[in-house]
Structures are given as C-alpha cells and as structure tokens.
C-alpha cells in the first residue's frame, strides 16, 4: 500500500529529526583562547577528549598551529566534559569544556575564564603541591635505602633503632601525603573536576576509601567511565597483591589471617546490629 509506505517513511524521517534535535540540544558551543611558549611557535597543538584515560583511545577533535605565541579552538561539544590540549612532544594540558571563553596558558600550565576551569586550576595547584612534596619524601626514602639489600633492610628495621625511627618518620609523612591526595579528590566528588583529579591520583587511594567514595559521590563522578575504569584497575591490583601475599604465607600465617578475618567480620556485625548475638567457635551465643 502506497499510503502506508509514505506514512512509515514520514514517521522514520520524523524520528530521525527528533533524534538529531535531542542530540544537538546536548551540544553547546565552546571557545578556547590560549598562550603558548615561544618554542611552540609554528607547531601543531591537538584538542583531544580523554576518553577512558588510555592514550591509545584519546579522541582528537581538532588541531591548530601556534602563531606568535597564541592559539585558539572553537566548536560544539556536550558539556561539561574533560579535554586535553596536547603538543607534538606529547605534553598535555587539561581543561573542561564549558560555556564561555576558556583561557589556557600553556607556558604557566594554567586554565580559567569559566567557573569549572577556575575550579580545576585551583584543584590542580593543590594536587601539584602534594605531588611535589611526595616526590621529595620518596627521594628521602630512596636515599635512606640506597645500596641496601632486602636482608640488610629487614635486619636494620629489627636491630637498628635509630634507622627504624628515621624510616618510620619518613613513612608516616609519606602516608599522610597520600591521605592528602584522597582528601583533595573527595573535596571534588560531586564535580567533573574530581573526575580529572581521580584520573591523576586515584590509584594512590586505599581501595576501601575508594569504595566509600564511590557510594558518596554524585553520579557525575561515580558513573563516569574514566572513574569506573580506574576503580576496576585498582580492584584487579588489590586481588593480585592479595594472591601474591597468600602464596608467600606459611600455613600458620594463613590460619592466623583466617582468625583475624573472622574476628573482623564479627566486629562489623556488632557495629551494624548492636543487639545481634554472634556464635563463638564453640557454637555458643
């Protein structure tokens, strides 16, 4: 029937038009104006999407040439979203697609001009300070252990109280700095800014803290593919580490670990259900 065919065709065209309209409505214009180092004059810069964090999966949206220390990008994209500007040497400079004119200073590694990019700049400065301090602390640990074999280190930790005190002090400082990374990420758990911070420092978080963060964070954070991939990587790393430790354990150590896990489970039940009665190993309440 010709009329039925025409009706189906019109419906199909209408559905296609609606789909395009819906997709287009999620897209908004962005404008980026930037300053670059003199060394980048006449060189290409690439505007990329981070994707899931894997370099091989970065999506190149556009490219431009630096002229007299300046460059620009413009277009339409779903917002907000994380993007990076990448030079020909592979150096990257993060920003967030957002309404308004985004300013980027590659020479100073700064971005701003819009609320989310201003926030990202503040957060990255904070994270960079923590990372710089961690680098200094890890360098102190390296210097303390340089030329030392594992057997010698183990012996010093048991028998050399001065060495043990120095090591414990540095380790405590390093763990506090790792905790600062976690706090920095948690402060942005309801923003796409936190997604980028998590991509930089998420693997430093203890896995238990990471699981709590995923429960507390907004869907913008917890359901982001970049975040979920990092959580899965951390989970796999934890499983590998536990398997390696278990393989190295003596039967006595395994039995002790089992008892400890059972005790931890009873404590957790007691915390959740204060009136609950838990059987002991003899079966008594």
Show which residues each predicted segment covers.
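Amphipathic alpha-helices of TPR/Sel1-like and other helical repeat/solenoid scaffolds
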Residues: 173-184, 209-220
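Short active-site neighborhood of thiol/selenol oxidoreductases, capturing the structured segment around
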Residues: 284-285
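Bacterial Sec-dependent N-terminal signal peptides
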Residues: 1-34
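Serine-centered coil/turn micro-motif
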Residues: 114, 118-121, 191, 221-228
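A non-transmembrane, solvent-exposed segment enriched in polar/low-complexity residues
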Residues: 26-182
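N-proximal helix/coil linker or "cap" segments that precede and/or mark the start of modular domains
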Residues: 213-281
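Amphipathic alpha-helical repeat scaffolds of TPR domains
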Residues: 189-200
């Amino acid at each position: 029937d010709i009329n039925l065919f025409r009706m189906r065709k019109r419906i199909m065209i209408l559905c296609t038009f609606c789909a395009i309209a819906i997709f287009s409505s999620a897209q908004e214009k962005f404008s980026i104006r930037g300053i670059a180092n003199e060394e980048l004059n006449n060189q290409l810069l690439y505007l990329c999407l981070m994707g899931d964090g894997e370099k091989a999966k970065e999506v190149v949206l556009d490219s431009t040439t630096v002229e007299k220390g300046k460059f620009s990008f413009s277009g339409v994209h779903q917002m907000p979203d994380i993007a990076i500007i990448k030079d020909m040497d592979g150096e990257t400079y993060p920003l967030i697609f957002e309404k308004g004119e985004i300013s980027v200073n590659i020479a100073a590694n700064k971005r701003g001009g819009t609320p989310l990019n201003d926030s990202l700049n503040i957060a990255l400065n904070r994270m960079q300070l923590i990372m710089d301090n961690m680098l200094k602390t890890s360098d102190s640990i390296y210097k303390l252990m340089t030329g030392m074999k594992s057997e010698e280190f183990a012996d010093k930790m048991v028998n050399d109280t001065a060495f043990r005190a120095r090591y414990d002090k540095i380790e405590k400082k390093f763990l506090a700095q790792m905790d600062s990374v976690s706090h920095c990420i948690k402060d942005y758990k309801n923003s796409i800014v936190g997604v980028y911070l998590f991509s930089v420092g998420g693997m430093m978080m203890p896995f238990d803290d990471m699981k709590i963060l995923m429960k507390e964070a907004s869907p913008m954070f917890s359901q982001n593919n970049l975040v979920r991939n990092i959580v899965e990587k951390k989970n796999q790393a934890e499983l590998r580490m536990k398997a390696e430790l278990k393989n190295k354990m003596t039967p006595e150590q395994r039995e002790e670990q089992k008892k400890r896990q059972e005790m931890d489970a009873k404590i957790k039940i007691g915390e959740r259900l204060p009136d609950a009665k838990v059987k002991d190993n003899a079966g008594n309440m």
